[in-house]
Amino acid sequence: MGKKKIHKRAIIVPDIHFPLQDDPAVEVVLKAIKMVKPNIFVCLGDLGEWKSVSPFKYKRRRRPPLEYVIEDLQKEVDAVEKGLDRFDKVLKSVKCPEMHMIEGNHDNWLNFFVEEYPYLKKFRFENAMHLAERGYKYHPYGKYLKIGKLYFYHGGHYTTTYHTKQHA
């Protein structure tokens, strides 16, 4: 007898950018999860927009006092968690056994912020989103996720117009 093939169903979702998400698109994905009942769910990075800690927000100006930044950041964390709750609810309802969170370049901005303020570890992406408690396998920015013969990677390293101009 031949080896029995195992078929897995997966849903891969890139670049949601909560709280700036496209709600109709999110609803379509949530319906797809209900229909497909995936064995695997992969968030392919940029779960949040993280405008409050964007390296571009204060490019030519000084950042305001930390207490103002933290207030904005906490609001953004709450909004992104609320968005992730929507996915978690549906994934739990279909009993999805394997969930992966790949850190995107926007998500990594939280880590850069914590590098500046090491006593704020609760704002590291993995911690702020409570990924372990939610049941996600966390994959840091720049690391590949391999499932079977497939590799998953966020990228985002060459997204500037400078790179395009240099390689056109």
Language-model-detected regions and their locations in the chain:
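Short, flexible, glycine/charge-rich loop motifs used to bind or transfer phosphoryl groups or to couple energy/partner
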Residues: 1-2, 31-32, 161-167
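Active-site neighborhood of phospho(di)ester-bond hydrolases with catalytic His/Asp-centered motifs
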Residues: 12-14, 40-46, 98-104, 139, ...
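Mobile, glycine- and charge-enriched loop segments
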Residues: 1-23, 148
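Core catalytic region of metal-dependent phosphoesterases/phosphodiesterases
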Residues: 18-134
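Short, flexible coil/linker segments at or flanking structured domains
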Residues: 4-6, 29, 133, 140
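Acidic, His/Gly-enriched loop-helix segments that form or flank divalent-metal centers
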Residues: 109-168
